[in-house]
């Protein structure tokens, strides 16, 4: 997630001077049927049997796994993990509705967690996938848990990177909502975002604690990923996405019956730590078999910060027989790397 973007007040004067015409992006009826930029890893695909058009990238061999990005992110947020997971899974890396090359439904879609969840289940139907692993980050983790709660027979396992059953309160995007809800100002903000001038600022915000410790190559790679988040931004869609955490209801009762194994990954240095701790408490009380893993130096977007460690955890949890290919991320005695803490349930699964 992009948490502090709306607080970049030092740029407001420049925003107001921008031409708003550059902020116009095609909506559903005008959506492109080909990606703006081809996938660097995998094959671009589009759904064909749904009312709205969803874009995804397909790569790999093995049991199916769907990767669900965060709120304003695209499938490219998983770019650093795709080469690590592709030898072990048939991966479907999504652009959620409203992001990347997927459609931007308007009047008939609110971008809530359940709506995005239904889109993914429809995609599974179209691809004739009866059951699969769901890997989601942040908003994508919320969607994954929602599917597991509402469609229990469609989910074999869930890997949730700082997602939630209990939404963050107050919404971290309330200031963004206010800005985007004003047409002239909102179009100017989106124009500035799409210009690329804020890509470095946004990358720093996303990476937070980890940014100063990254080398130049990693920073450039993350900035490139972020640039694909922002170049498809539109005012109405990003306004709806910003509202999504407020308009999506907690699904605490439904989640109590989740039967699929769940691995919950979090970072102690995350800017959403309060939200993750609230949800960790919920899991401990109502879903004690959820495997909880915390990275001591981890941020919110572990898929960007720690792709190899995260991929290794996913393999060890979902497909332990395949995990030896990433054994370099663990010590020879089979214990987790230093800086990782986990509950007893996961220790038993990990050894």
Identify the function of each model-found stretch.
Residues 257-298:
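Conserved loop-alpha-helix segment in the C-terminal half of the alpha/beta-hydrolase fold
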Residues 52-103:
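Conserved HGGG/HGGXW glycine-rich cap/lid loop of the alpha/beta-hydrolase fold
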Residues 17, 21-45:
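An N-terminal hydrophobic leader/cap segment in hydrolases
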Residues 50, 93-135, 139:
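Active-site loop/oxyanion-hole signature of alpha/beta-hydrolase fold enzymes
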Residues 141-152, 158:
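Short glycine-enriched nucleophile-adjacent loop
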Residues 170, 192-256:
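Conserved alpha/beta-hydrolase catalytic His-Asp/Glu region
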Residues 287-351:
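Catalytic active-site module of serine/aspartate enzymes centered on a nucleophile-bearing elbow/loop
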Residues 149, 158-192:
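Flexible "cap/lid" loop of the alpha/beta hydrolase fold
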């Amino acid at each position: 997630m992009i948490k502090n973007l709306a607080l970049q007040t030092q740029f407001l004067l420049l925003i107001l001077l921008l031409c708003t015409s550059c902020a116009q992006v095609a909506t559903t009826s005008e959506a492109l049927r080909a990606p703006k930029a081809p996938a660097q890893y995998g094959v671009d695909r589009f759904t064909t049997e749904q009312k709205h058009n969803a874009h995804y990238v397909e790569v790999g061999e093995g049991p199916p796994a769907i990767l669900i990005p965060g709120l304003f992110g695209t499938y490219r947020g998983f770019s650093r993990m795709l080469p690590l997971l592709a030898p072990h899974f048939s991966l479907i890396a999504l652009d959620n509705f409203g992001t990347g090359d997927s459609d931007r439904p308007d009047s008939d879609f609110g971008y809530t967690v359940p709506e995005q969840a239904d889109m993914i289940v429809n995609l599974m139907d179209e691809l004739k996938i009866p059951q699969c692993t769901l890997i989601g980050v942040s908003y994508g983790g919320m969607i994954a848990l929602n599917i597991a709660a509402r469609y229990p027979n469609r989910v074999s396992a869930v890997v949730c990177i700082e997602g939630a059953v209990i939404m963050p309160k107050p919404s971290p995007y309330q200031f963004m909502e206010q800005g985007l809800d004003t047409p002239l100002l909102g179009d100017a903000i989106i124009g500035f975002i799409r210009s690329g001038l804020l890509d470095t600022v946004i990358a720093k915000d996303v990476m937070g604690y980890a940014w100063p410790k990254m080398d130049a190559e990693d920073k450039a790679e993350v900035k490139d990923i972020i640039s694909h988040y922002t170049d498809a931004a539109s005012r109405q869609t990003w306004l709806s996405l910003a509202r999504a955490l407020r308009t999506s209801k907690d699904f605490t009762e439904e989640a109590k019956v989740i039967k699929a194994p769940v691995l919950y990954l979090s970072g102690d240095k995350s800017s959403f730590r309060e939200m993750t701790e609230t949800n960790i408490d919920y899991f401990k009380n109502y879903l004690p078999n959820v495997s909880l893993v915390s990275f001591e130096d981890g941020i919110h977007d572990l898929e960007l910060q720690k792709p190899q460690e995260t991929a290794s955890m996913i393999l060890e949890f979902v497909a332990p027989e395949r995990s030896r290919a990433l054994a370099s991320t663990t010590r020879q005695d089979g214990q987790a790397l230093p800086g990782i803490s986990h509950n007893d349930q996961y220790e038993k699964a990990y050894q």
